[in-house]
């Protein structure tokens, strides 16, 4: 049928737009996209499935159409933004709640009737004291529901905009809505007709001539509108006019008295509301006077019950005399009672004024913020009057209305929304809490007129007007309603119990519908999984082409169909078919894996679409992130311009000429250049010769030619080193050499003995080594660098037993090694003994010679061992003799020094002495008493020097010294063997008179005595030796004076040498 096809097309278009809104919440739909929905001829109920659009427009149709349509359009715009925010991936921080005191919300959404109902459709169903919020158990909003409601809000806002612009394709829509509203108003007026006829017999007439009889008040609707405001374009009764125009923004409006109003009943606006006389036609006795052919409009209205406190008020009253709430106030719940039982109301405050809840300051009615603390006005929780002391607040009713009150309180009435039979006064249903029109269902058996003719009842004791009186209705209807109420309360109890356990109300209701169990929560835990599996299996059997169904899809279908198994299977199949069609329209059919994606993601189309898109883009992602080298293009193509454009665009070269230069270098034969190297070089220069040199730099170590950007260069020199040589050199230096050997492999710079160059060099070398070395080698570099820094600390010590270094900050001579836990002397490096305590190192050594049998057994070898070699730079001790080469290389700090005088050895061109004659060779500057020179003396000459200065020396082994097995010198030396270096005894022949030592070690023994006693060997120099020493130290060739004899010449040279080159503390050996 055409109607069904139009409805189907409308739903398809509507679902497409909702899906687009879910995918992109910020998407703006054009008028062309919305036209299929706007041009539809379906009724409003079929076009707006969630939103009650007709009621929303009718409830706000007051005044000029353009004014209220603009107001409604603005409110819908804000509501649309609420929906889009809920659909956005980055929702606002406080998306879960909406505050009523928000100025934007209060001036737009809350200014129209039905705005809060739209928020409840979004999911804001939890009532808060100051707003609405999502339920606590709901972590995320229902995207489908939110998208559908947002689309309908958007559609209605667009329709209203088109109506205002007179461009709506169905312009008669607004007229139809307004005609329906007029018909509804007339229907409600006709419903009052029987009641009015019963109260006041006579025809119910309405004024036919405008202005002949004033209409009802625009604000309260109960009293006649006797005052007309041209600015507001509304008619108000005097009481409402006083309240409405008391606002500062409307205080300047001028009002006019409508014609046909008696001047006696007109109230001056200058009088307060409490001083205004009541209209004369409000007496209830006057309603029964048959002489009145037409009732006064004011007397055609009934006394009204307050919906909050059930107080019976007179017809002309705008606010309830008990709780100060307006006549149109909806039914409210109990509030928190104050200390006087007034529910927190303050009767001392003037009507309309309000007290700040923070500072209790009394503010004017028009004030929005407190005048003292500037905090906003908060809504007061409503309450019922429950204390007997509140009777003083209520005005005593008229004696004539007491009979009407008794009759009205004995009435029962049906709610027009839920058809519940109510017996309490007022028109707020106790079941659905909604207000109904005041149409009593049953009347008292006697008419009001007969009861009124008997005169007023006798006055009695005052009674509470707010207490409802019990009444009864028909037994069958009452029983039916009681049963419905009992079942409803039971269902509500089950739902609350389920929500406490994490089950939603739909699950509880569906469980009851499916199983009829009395314990639905237990059934959901035990039986629901099997039911869902059965639904999924039956759905798969019904249409095997749709693939397997997930339990999530079965669950949603089962809940949507309220537990009906067959309908759930149909819904599951229908939903899956629609989702497959949606994915297929997007380019993903079943052959692309759409069925499997839907199953994996529980039927979620957006997640399934994301998965399918990810699978389709996977080859592109792999190709994009592939770490392999890019294919090298061919540079021999005939289209040179195309190649130049490619270089210019892809590699961002500075100019067209640079791109042509790069292409010419790439086309040269032989082709030894890489593309990246050429591009990098061309960016720095455009000189072809310079670029060729830049692209062919030779390694200073191996001679391999590489581009300059691949070479490594140190900051200390201009040598260029290829990556392989750089990595290999520094790896070997780290693993097999000292930290000071990490210099340039080509030129050997810088000199790492200079502390000023050391810091700057290693700071830049660290960055280069991090990118070139292996992680273990780089870690070793940092370890050695740290040790080198620690060795420069003046409090650094080397253990004399295990060669472990540590920082020793104590002042005592006794130090304990943290590694081997051996104790030794800080100064002499000998193993600590109790005899050393309180003695100097020299006294302790003499004590060892005289009292230690082991020391005596070793003889002079122990003396030489104790007077071993100490590195002057790092203080590391070597228990070795000085025989052999005097050039010593410290294994710890790589310092080169003389083992006799501890002066440094200098490499080629490193000597700081400006007048040095041997600067171009490895050399050292020794004092004249150094073993370096005295080892050439004979033992007898050394003995003579000691004898001349009365120094005792040994010529025979000390008493108790043991001989070495096999004979030979027993002094320990470091000897080079095929496997490395080894410490062992000297083993050379020991001549007689040499104290059991070989000739070299006996000379070392004698020289150590000469150095210990600071003896100057120059006293035994011959003339030739004096001239050589003078030339060596003073850099001049001495000549004898004229007539100077040789002895005088020798004495003069000796005096000059000893005075100008003394043997003082400048010798490093004496400072150790």
UniProtKB/Swiss-Prot annotation:
Q: Which amino acids does the record list as binding Zn(2+) 5? A: 871, 874, 890, 893
Q: What is the effect of changing residue 399 to H?
A: In IMD115; uncertain significance; decreased interaction with SHARPIN; does not affect interaction with RBCK1; the genetic variation producing this missense variant predominantly affects splicing, leading to in-frame skipping of exon 9 and lack of 84 amino acids from residue 496 to 579
UniProt GO cellular component terms: CD40 receptor complex; cytoplasmic side of plasma membrane; cytosol; LUBAC complex
| UniProt-reported outcome of changing residue 699 to S | Abolishes polyubiquitination activity of LUBAC
Q: In which tissues is it expressed?
A: Expressed in both normal and transformed breast epithelial cell lines.
Q: Which reactions fall under this protein's catalytic activity?
A: [E2 ubiquitin-conjugating enzyme]-S-ubiquitinyl-L-cysteine + [acceptor protein]-L-lysine = [E2 ubiquitin-conjugating enzyme]-L-cysteine + [acceptor protein]-N(6)-ubiquitinyl-L-lysine
Q: Spans of biased composition, class Polar residues?
A: 265-280
Q: Which residues bind Zn(2+) 1?
A: 699, 702, 722, 725
Q: Where does Zn(2+) 3 bind?
A: 799, 802, 817, 820
Q: Zinc fingers (IBR-type): give the ranges.
A: 779-841
For the region LDD domain, give the residue spans. Answer: 910-1072
Effect after changing residue 871 to S: Abolishes polyubiquitination activity of LUBAC
Detail which positions bind Zn(2+) 4: 825, 828, 836, 841
Q: What is the effect of changing residue 360 to A?
A: Decreased ubiquitin-binding and ability to promote formation of the bacterial ubiquitin coat
Q: Where do the segments described as Disordered lie?
A: 263-290, 443-484
* Stretches the record annotates as Interaction with RBCK1: 563-616
Under the subunit heading, UniProt states:
Component of the LUBAC complex (linear ubiquitin chain assembly complex) which consists of SHARPIN, RBCK1 and RNF31. LUBAC has a MW of approximately 600 kDa suggesting a heteromultimeric assembly of its subunits. Associates with the TNF-R1 signaling complex (TNF-RSC) in a stimulation-dependent manner. Interacts (via the PUB domain) with OTULIN (via the PIM motif); the interaction is direct. Interacts (via the PUB domain) with VCP (via the PIM motif). Interacts (via the PUB domain) with SPATA2 (via the PIM motif); interaction is direct and bridges RNF31 and CYLD.
The name on file for this protein is: E3 ubiquitin-protein ligase RNF31
The species this protein belongs to is Homo sapiens (Human)
Q: Which gene encodes it?
A: RNF31
């Amino acid at each position: 049928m055409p109607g069904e096809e139009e409805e189907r097309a409308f739903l398809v278009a509507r679902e497409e737009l909702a899906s687009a809104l879910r995918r992109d919440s910020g998407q703006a739909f054009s008028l062309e996209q919305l036209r299929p929905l706007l041009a539809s001829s379906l009724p409003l109920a079929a076009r707006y499935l969630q939103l009650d659009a007709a009621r929303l427009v009718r409830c706000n149709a007051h005044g000029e159409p353009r004014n209220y349509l603009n107001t409604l359009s603005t409110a819908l715009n804000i509501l649309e933004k609420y929906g889009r925010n809920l659909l956005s991936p980055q929702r606002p921080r406080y998306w879960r709640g909406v505050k009523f005191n928000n100025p934007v919300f209060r001036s737009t959404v809350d200014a129209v009737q039905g705005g809060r109902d739209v928020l409840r459709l979004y999911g804001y169903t939890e009532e808060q004291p100051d707003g609405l919020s999502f339920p606590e158990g709901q972590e995320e909003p229902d995207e489908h529901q939110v998208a559908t409601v947002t689309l309908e809000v958007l559609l209605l806002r667009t329709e209203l905009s088109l109506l205002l612009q007179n461009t709506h394709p169905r312009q008669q829509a607004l007229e139809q809505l307004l005609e329906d509203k007029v018909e509804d108003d007339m229907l409600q007026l006709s419903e009052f007709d029987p009641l009015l006829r019963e109260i006041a017999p006579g025809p119910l007439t309405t004024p036919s001539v405008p202005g002949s009889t004033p209409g009802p008040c625009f604000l309260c609707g109960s009293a006649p509108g006797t005052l007309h405001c041209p600015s507001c374009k509304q008619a108000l009764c005097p009481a409402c006019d006083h309240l409405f125009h008391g606002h500062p923004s409307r205080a300047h409006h001028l009002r006019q008295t409508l014609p046909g109003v008696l001047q006696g009943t007109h109230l001056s606006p200058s009088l307060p509301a409490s001083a205004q006389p009541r209209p004369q036609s409000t007496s209830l006795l006057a309603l029964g006077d048959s002489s009145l052919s037409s009732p006064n409009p004011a007397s055609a209205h009934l006394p009204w019950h307050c919906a909050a406190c059930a107080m019976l008020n007179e017809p002309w009253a705008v606010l309830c005399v008990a709780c100060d709430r307006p006549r149109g106030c909806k039914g409210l719940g109990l509030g928190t009672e104050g200390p006087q039982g007034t529910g927190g109301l303050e009767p001392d405050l003037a009507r309309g004024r309000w007290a700040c809840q923070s500072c209790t300051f009394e503010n004017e009615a028009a004030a929005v913020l407190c005048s003292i603390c500037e905090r906003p006005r908060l809504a007061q929780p409503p309450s019922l009057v429950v204390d007997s002391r509140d009777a003083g607040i209520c005005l005593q009713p008229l004696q004539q209305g007491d009979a009407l009150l008794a009759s009205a309180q004995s009435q029962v009435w049906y709610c027009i929304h839920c058809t519940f039979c109510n017996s309490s006064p007022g028109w707020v249903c106790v079941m659905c809490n909604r207000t109904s029109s005041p149409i009593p269902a049953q009347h008292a058996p006697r008419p009001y007129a007969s009861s009124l003719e008997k005169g007023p009842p006798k006055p009695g004791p005052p009674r509470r007007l707010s207490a409802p009186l019990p009444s009864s209705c028909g037994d069958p209807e009452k029983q039916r309603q009681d049963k419905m109420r009992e079942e409803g309360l039971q269902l509500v109890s089950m739902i609350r119990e389920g929500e406490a356990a994490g089950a939603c109300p739909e699950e509880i209701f569906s469980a009851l519908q499916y199983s009829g169990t009395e314990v639905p929560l237990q059934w959901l835990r035990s039986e629901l999984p099997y039911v869902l599996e059965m639904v999924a299996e039956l759905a798969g059997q019904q249409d095997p082409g749709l693939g397997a169904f997930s339990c999530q899809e079965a669950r949603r279908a089962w809940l949507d169909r309220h537990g009906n198994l067959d309908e759930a299977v149909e819904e599951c199949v229908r939903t899956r078919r629609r989702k497959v069609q949606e994915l297929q329209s997007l380019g993903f059919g079943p052959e692309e894996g759409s069925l499997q994606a839907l199953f994996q993601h529980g039927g979620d189309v957006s997640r399934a679409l994301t998965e399918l898109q990810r699978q389709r883009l996977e080859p592109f992602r792999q190709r994009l992130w592939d770490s392999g080298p890019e294919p090298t293009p061919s540079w021999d193509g005939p289209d040179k311009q195309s190649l130049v454009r490619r270089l210019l665009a892809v590699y961002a070269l500075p100019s067209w000429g640079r791109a042509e230069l790069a292409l010419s270098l790439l086309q040269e034969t032989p082709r030894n250049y890489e593309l990246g190297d050429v591009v990098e070089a061309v960016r720095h220069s455009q000189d072809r010769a310079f670029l060729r040199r830049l692209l062919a730099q030779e390694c200073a170590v191996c001679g391999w030619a590489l581009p300059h950007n691949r070479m490594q260069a140190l900051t200390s020199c201009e040598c260029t080193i290829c990556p392989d040589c750089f990595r290999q050199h520094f790896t070997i230096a780290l693993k097999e050499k000292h930290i000071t050997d990490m210099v340039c492999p080509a030129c050997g710079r810088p000199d790492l003995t200079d502390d000023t160059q050391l810091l700057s060099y290693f700071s830049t070398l660290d960055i280069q080594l991090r990118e070139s070395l292996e992680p273990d080698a780089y870690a070793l570099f940092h370890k050695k660098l740290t040790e080198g820094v620690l060795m420069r600390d003046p409090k650094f010590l080397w253990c004399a037993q295990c060669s472990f270094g540590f920082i020793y900050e104590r002042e005592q001579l006794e130090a304990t090694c943290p590694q081997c836990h051996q104790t030794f002397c800080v100064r002499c490096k000998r193993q600590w003994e109790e005899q050393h305590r309180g003695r100097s190192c020299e006294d302790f050594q003499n004590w060892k010679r005289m009292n230690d049998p082991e020391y005596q057994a070793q003889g002079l070898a122990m003396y030489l061992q104790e007077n071993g070699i100490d590195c002057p730079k790092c203080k590391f001790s070597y228990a070795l003799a000085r025989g052999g080469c005097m050039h010593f290389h410290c294994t710890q700090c790589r310092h080169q020094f003389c083992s006799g005088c501890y002066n440094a050895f200098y490499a080629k061109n490193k000597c700081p002495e400006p007048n040095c004659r041997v600067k171009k060779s490895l050399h050292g500057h020794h004092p004249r008493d150094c073993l370096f020179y005295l080892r050439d003396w004979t033992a007898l000459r050394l003995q003579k020097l000691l004898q001349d200065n009365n120094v005792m020396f040994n010529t025979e082994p000390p008493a108790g010294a043991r001989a070495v097995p096999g004979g030979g010198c027993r002094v320990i030396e470091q000897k080079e063997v095929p496997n490395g270096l080894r410490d062992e005894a000297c083993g050379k022949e020991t001549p007689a008179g040499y104290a059991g030592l070989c000739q070299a070690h006996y000379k070392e023994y004698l020289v150590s005595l000469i150095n210990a006693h600071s003896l100057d060997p120059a006293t035994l120099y011959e003339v030739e030796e004096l001239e050589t020493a003078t030339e060596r130290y003073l850099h001049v060739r001495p000549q004898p004076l004229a007539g100077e004899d040789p002895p005088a010449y020798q004495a003069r040279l000796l005096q000059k040498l000893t005075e100008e080159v003394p043997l003082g503390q400048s010798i490093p050996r004496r400072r150790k």
